[in-house]
C-alpha cells in the first residue's frame, strides 16, 4: 500500500490545477525538463529536502563521492560533465537535467576553459543522511 507523504500531497495539489490554468492567458505553464524512474528513494517518515546551488569556475570539479539517495541536477549555465564509475562520461548542457544514482562513485566537472558552470541540486533523504560521502 502506498502512503502519501506531506511533500507528495503538496506537489499533487500544485499539479492538479496545471491543465486548466495552463490554458488561461496570464498563467505560467511549467515545462517538463526531466522525467526518470529511479531507485534508492528514502523510506523514513521524516525526510529532508535540500535545494542547493553550485558554481564551478572553468576546470573545477567535485570531490570523488557517492550519494545515499538519488540527486537531481539542473544545469543553468555552461555544461556539466558527469563521470560515474564504470560508465562513459556524460555531458549535460544548460537547460537540461540529470539524476545521479545512489551508491555510485562519481565526480563532476566543468571541462570548459572559459565558461562558468552554474547548477541547481535537489536532494531528498532521510533526515540524518549527509548530502554526500567522499570516496578516498
For the regions a language model picked out, list residue spans one by one.
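Short acidic-glycine-tyrosine-enriched beta hairpin
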Residues: 86-103
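Positively charged n-region of N-terminal signal peptides that target proteins for export
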Residues: 1-4
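Ligand-binding loop in jelly-roll beta-barrel domains
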Residues: 89, 103-128
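Histidine-centered metal-chelating micro-motifs
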Residues: 61-63, 81, 98, 102-109, ...
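Sec/Tat signal peptide C-region and signal peptidase I cleavage site
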Residues: 18-22
Amino acid at each position: 500500500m502506498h502512503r502519501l507523504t506531506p511533500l507528495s500531497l503538496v506537489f499533487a495539489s500544485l499539479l492538479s490545477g496545471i491543465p486548466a490554468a495552463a490554458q488561461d492567458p496570464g498563467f505560467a505553464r511549467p515545462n517538463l525538463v526531466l522525467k526518470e524512474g529511479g531507485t534508492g528513494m528514502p523510506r523514513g517518515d521524516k525526510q529532508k529536502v535540500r535545494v542547493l546551488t553550485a558554481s564551478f569556475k572553468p576546470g573545477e570539479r567535485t570531490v570523488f563521492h557517492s550519494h545515499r539517495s538519488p540527486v537531481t541536477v539542473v544545469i543553468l549555465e555552461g555544461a556539466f560533465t558527469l563521470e560515474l564509475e564504470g560508465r562513459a562520461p556524460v555531458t549535460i548542457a544548460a537547460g537540461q537535467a540529470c539524476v545521479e544514482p545512489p551508491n555510485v562513485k562519481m565526480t563532476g566537472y566543468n571541462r570548459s576553459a572559459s565558461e562558468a558552470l552554474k547548477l541547481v541540486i535537489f536532494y531528498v533523504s532521510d533526515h540524518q543522511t549527509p548530502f554526500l560521502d567522499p570516496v578516498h
